[in-house]
Amino acid sequence: MFSSIEEVIQDIKEGKMIVLVDDEDRENEGDVIIAAEKAGPEAINFMATHAKGLICMPIIGERLDELEIHDMVTENTDNHETAFTVTVDYRGTTTGISAFERAATVKALIDSVSKPSDFRKPGHIFPLRYREGGVLRRAGHTEGSIDLTRLAGLYPAAVICEVMNEDGTMARLPQLLEFARQHNLKLASIADLIEYRRRKEKLVVRVTDAQLPTMYGDFVAVAYESLLDNKGHIALVKGEWEEDEPILVRVHSECLTGDVFGSRRCDCGEQLETAMSMIASEGKGVLLYMRQEGRGIGLLNKIKAYKLQDNGRDTVEANLELGFPADLRDYGIGAQILVDLGVRKMRLMTNNPKKIRGLEGYGLEVVERVAIEMPHKPENTRYLRTKKEKMGHLLASL
């Protein structure tokens, strides 16, 4: 259904248009996209005639600031925070609306000799400010189009236009598939672009390390920072190992209530203690402590979820009622940390099959699943049963 990101990058590099589709949980829309430096009047006319949506120009903020093109509003209340700026026309145009004159404005916006006085405001080109970090920060067409131009080695700007149906409604995936087929355009998804970038780019940096004596023995605490959200993650490392040696690993998501306060609503604290004890007994291994509180929803939202559970929802229902998926965690950052530590094969301490799939999806090999099942208690039996029945956790005692 979707072309590979490699194929799409090649088309962008060659000056061809593609269709980029976002997630069905977001807008579920498709935009025709072309690199700005490849966008001539023919491409603009195609968008106006066949795509029929609003023709916009994603571009990096640095260039917008150089040209003194400011945001359209000071307080953005758009549902998806689409970062429109004041519209512009190149001063060398007349009305600015024709395909030829819009193409001229696009070219002027990326021309290094252009200066702020070369543009009239308002105009007929709608610049969109790119959020640095791209689709890894915001999964929108603005970021997706710029990421593709950068991956193609072109100037970080694009021209995009939403695809509308003949009846004026927005084209969804079935119609977008037909549109792409009819016009011989490759179709790509932002989800695939996110996955591509996560696989190809290093998204964590090692900050420092220090000795950490614990009640379970001596570890080395290695601190990492994610380049996606600036969160810090900690790996507790014990011993040394050969490159191909399967290492005992626990990827543990932060749980303040369980790990620190000893909450009996979950089994997280006991799992943390058990994992550290097992690694210490083994003499080598890694405990990776990820800042993914509440399966990724954060501490305050987790307490809100607890309140909903007090009122009868289970842990999955509570997340959904708050507007979150059952599990927001992504294992790409954790996988990159493990690779940086020299882990290639692991004996993974987990009850969660999704965690195994998530880590293996980034090239790590899980040679064995080591169960880390704690005795359930009256306060957490329902929670654990929900994880087994609705999330597929492997819990033999329930």
UniProtKB/Swiss-Prot annotation:
EC assignment: 4.1.99.12, 3.5.4.25
Region annotated GTP cyclohydrolase II, chain positions: 200-398
Region ranges (DHBP synthase): 1-199
Keywords assigned: GTP-binding, Hydrolase, Lyase, Magnesium, Manganese, Metal-binding, Multifunctional enzyme, Nucleotide-binding, Riboflavin biosynthesis, Zinc
UniProt: Zn(2+) binding residues: 255, 266, 268
UniProt keyword Metal-binding present: yes
Pathway named in the protein's UniProt entry: Cofactor biosynthesis; riboflavin biosynthesis; 2-hydroxy-3-oxobutyl phosphate from D-ribulose 5-phosphate: step 1/1; Cofactor biosynthesis; riboflavin biosynthesis; 5-amino-6-(D-ribitylamino)uracil from GTP: step 1/4
Sequence positions that bind Mg(2+) 1: 27
One of the protein's GO biological processes: riboflavin biosynthetic process
A GO CC annotation given for this chain: cytosol
Pfam families, A to Z: DHBP_synthase, GTP_cyclohydro2
Binding site for D-ribulose 5-phosphate: 26-27, 31, 138-142, 162
Keyword Nucleotide-binding belongs to the record: yes
Gene3D superfamilies in UniProt: DHBP synthase (3.90.870.10), GTP cyclohydrolase II (3.40.50.10990)
Binding site for GTP: 250-254, 271, 293-295, 315, 350, 355
Its biological purpose: Catalyzes the conversion of D-ribulose 5-phosphate to formate and 3,4-dihydroxy-2-butanone 4-phosphate. Catalyzes the conversion of GTP to 2,5-diamino-6-ribosylamino-4(3H)-pyrimidinone 5'-phosphate (DARP), formate and pyrophosphate.
Family: In the N-terminal section; belongs to the DHBP synthase family.
Alphabetized HAMAP family for the sequence: RibA (MF_00179), RibB (MF_00180), RibBA (MF_01283)
The protein, known as: Riboflavin biosynthesis protein RibBA
Species in which this protein is naturally found: Syntrophomonas wolfei subsp. wolfei (strain DSM 2245B / Goettingen)
